[in-house]
Amino acid sequence: MRVHVLYFADAREAVGRTEEWLEVPPGVATVGALRDHLCARGGPWAVLARRGTRFAINRAVAPGASAPIHDGDEIAVFPAISGG
């Protein structure tokens, strides 16, 4: 399966890229599994495991780590939004 991953804000700064097309191995079928796969790269990729990091699938916020991903999906990675 191949997905298009977009990185925003601190995720973009940490990993040093704005986007990539990623071939994911079998078994990576959810947002949580994709996050773990990316974090396994080590080093700056660990920022994606931070509490509050959010994911969107095809421009809709993923409801949780168990949200399924599919071939060709656009996955956005961004920090939690806060305000006041």
Residue ranges and their predicted role:
Residues 1-83:
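Ubiquitin-like/PB1-type beta-grasp interaction modules and other compact soluble beta-rich domains
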